[in-house]
Amino acid sequence: MKNQFLEITDPIHDFIRLNSTEQKIIDTSVFQRLRRIKQLSGAHLTYPGAQHTRFEHSLGVMHIAGMAGTSLASKKQMPVTDIDDIRLAALLHDIGHGPFSHLFEEVLQKKKHITHEQIGKEIILKSEIGDIISKTTDKKKINRLAVGEGKKQFENEIISGALSADMMDYLLRDGYFTGAEHAKIDHNRITNSFEIYKNKLALQSSALVNFETMMISRFQMFKAVYFHKTVRAGEVMLLEAMSLADDHLGLSEMNAKEYVEQTDDTILEKLTSLPETNSELKAAKKIAIDYQNRKLFKCVFEKTISGKKSFGKNTLKQFRQDIAKKSKLAESQVFIDTTTTHSMPLAPSKKESNSIILIKKEGSKITPQIIPISEIPLVSTMSGKMNILRAYTQQKNRNKVEMAAKSILGEL
């Protein structure tokens, strides 16, 4: 049967073309659920336009991954037949995300140490999505590739890492919908400049400036959007409410079938409808209702911790206890947030990317060069971690907690 194509209009990529297998996958209820999971959790309370979801982001990642595959295939560096597999894996790279994306994952990790990648693998193998994939290719191969465990390293790097389709789409898309002007990325130039060297993804040296611009854009987006103090206030509230209500709602005990029925709205509805049978549930319900009505926690202390220093859970717990004691408040009224990310994207191995392979072409002569990211002038200034320590509380406790937090955290 002739493959039927469908074109979807997209504000980032103009048109995204889907083949029949891709169409069948996005039409499943499991995939359609991503329409109801916001890409940026609670950022819409600060940036009203940030209503975009994991659904359209997944389509965008598939599109850019296809561009990367087409570029490499045109240079005879990979078979044309592998492009569809890369696109499928990219389409499904976020299929395991739960409500409120990474926030729900934090709740799962506290008790079960489960990641959205692990859940995604189970969904691909055991749901109708796996059955659809099996009609055209190996679902186990797609499953591995979607979570960065494919046999060909360069294919993993197309989906996640310093040159990934995932990062290019989320920066472009998040910048567009938040209205932030930091996401300046020429993804066409970058993907057209892809090469393969020793089974790893490389970049033509002439596109180094585009890589630098992308890394700077990423750094700025973290500072201006992802780690914005008010964005984080909403996320701290969601995380606290879900953590307090976990035992009652069984959020971390859900099986795969229950998990894929959950969305941002279903979880928020459960939180705002909690019975007030104990202090934890009462607090969780109040926080959720305040979040829903945008009565957000107030940031009373903020400090950027430079370099590679970070704080463990026990240290953060001690900070919370000390500030509460000094403020003469219950510990439940003080919230410590530390936003930490590597300044460079993580490779598929989950380790920080520390080098990039540049390919210099002069006629028929090809010269590869492995450049430590620390030696790229514009990028090296951002090496280490972005680590921001903040203290939050309710409006009524603002002055007390501010004084205590400055006293305890000010000299760090």
Outline where the language-model segments fall:
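Histidine-centered, transition-metal-coordinating active-site segments
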Residues: M1-D85, H97-L412
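Short alpha-helical catalytic segment bearing the HExxH-like zincin motif
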Residues: I86-L91
